[in-house]
């Protein structure tokens, strides 16, 4: 439906993340097709700044966005979004799992992880309301 498509587009628009996502300092799209993009993202948190590269697969027919980690401070990063129709609009399954190479960074982020995810999801919700209205 229309709602899933709008929200899919919002999440797929990685280049605009710095406009609304906390801790996202910059995003540069290296290459982009209808089904794949490669992006460099700079995150800053508690005085720490890191850049990473990811390959984002856009599976629009099935409503799935998958992120594959390419390069940066992580040992691994797995992330996906699944958009499903729902009577009240759209149900979104968001999954993220990662580990930093640096033990210090990992310890810092573990303390703030739940709040960070909550704020990130809140930022996407606020952006959706800003662009598309409250429903």
Annotate each language-model stretch with its function:
Residues 68-119:
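Beta-strand/loop substructures that line and gate deep hydrophobic ligand-binding cavities in soluble
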Residues 15, 113, 117, 121, ...:
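Short amphipathic alpha-helical signal-transduction/dimerization elements
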Residues 1-34, 88, 123, 134:
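Hydrophobic ligand-binding cavity/cleft-lining segments
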Residues 23, 50, 61, 75-77:
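Residues that act as N-cap/strand-start positions at coil-to-secondary-structure junctions
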Residues 26, 53, 78-80:
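Conserved beta-strand residues within beta-sheet cores
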Residues 18, 28-70, 123, 135:
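Glycine-rich portal/gate segments that line the openings of hydrophobic small-molecule binding cavities
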């Amino acid at each position: 439906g229309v709602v899933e498509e709008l929200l899919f587009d919002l999440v797929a628009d990685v280049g605009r993340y710095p406009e609304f996502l906390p801790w996202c300092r910059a995003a540069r799209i290296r290459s982009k097709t209808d089904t794949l993009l490669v992006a460099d993202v700079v995150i800053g948190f508690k005085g720490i700044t890191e850049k990473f590269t990811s390959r984002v697969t856009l599976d629009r027919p099935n409503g799935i966005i998958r992120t594959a980690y390419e390069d940066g401070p992580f040992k691994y990063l797995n992330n996906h979004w699944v958009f499903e129709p729902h009577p009240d609009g759209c149900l979104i399954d968001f999954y993220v799992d990662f580990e930093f190479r640096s033990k210090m960074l990992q310890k810092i982020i573990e303390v703030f992880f739940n709040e960070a995810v909550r704020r990130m999801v809140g930022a996407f919700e606020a952006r959706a309301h800003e662009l598309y209205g409250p429903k």
